[in-house]
Amino acid sequence: MLQRDYIQRLIREFMAALERMLEKKEVEVRREKIRELYNQYVGPYAFYSIATIEDVMKAMAGIADEEKRLSKMDMLAELYYHEADTVGQPTRDELLTTAFMLFDYVDAHGDTFSIERRNKMAEIKQKVGDALK
């Protein structure tokens, strides 16, 4: 029970920090805040900024607690999703594709339904198109 409360509190803190980052207008400031969020909530930005989906899944497999693993994957997907708005092509599509795959995994394996997650997945499909097939 304490583990679940901790994870939920961590997610709330992360979402609040993400909202504060989104209020920043300047792209460089947003990028720096995103880097800070990676390092604070998910893991080293130096790794996740260049990791393939296979690398990410291997890293996440090291987290034994499934709820914690899915929460981190969801946070990472959010970071990829929002970071895509701060970069150009082809990096944008790569980030969106990775975000989609993580959202899809969390959606399939998690026990929490999220309409917001589904909406983001639909938006990514529109933006990226055939790359997801």
PLM regions and their residue ranges:
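Aromatic-enriched hydrophobic runs in primary sequence
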Residues: Y6, E26, E36-Y41, Y80-Y81, ...
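Amphipathic alpha-helical binding modules
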Residues: Q89-K133
